[in-house]
Amino acid sequence: MFANYNYNDFPIVKVDLSGNIENNEDFLNFTNQWLQLYNKKQEFEFIFDTYKCGLINPKYCLYTALFIKKIKQEKIQYLKKSIIYVYNKYIFHLLKIIFYIEKPVAPIDIIFNDLLNNSTTIQTI
């Protein structure tokens, strides 16, 4: 499974993104769990960890942007903040594409840990 949601620290929801999105079913699993959080009608925050994330087909940038657009149409936004830990430039650039196409639902801190150059960059969107 591409996205593993951990609700143990709710309202902080940790999402471990591992491997690749093998098919649309993997992507729908990721978005359906997000929608289930909205159905609870309680505020929450995301912490995404992409350390084990593989190469993702860029088409999922568009799918994610369209999903964000759909979420933004909700009358009440329960997502209050996200932190995304990124460890490679490829994933970092995919995120930039997503948020260029569609602005995020809530403030996001992207923490890019460049393991090759031993540096950390924080970008707030």
Q: What feature does the model see in each segment?
A:
Residues 1-125:
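Amphipathic, Lys/Arg-enriched alpha-helical "gate/interface" segment within cytosolic domains
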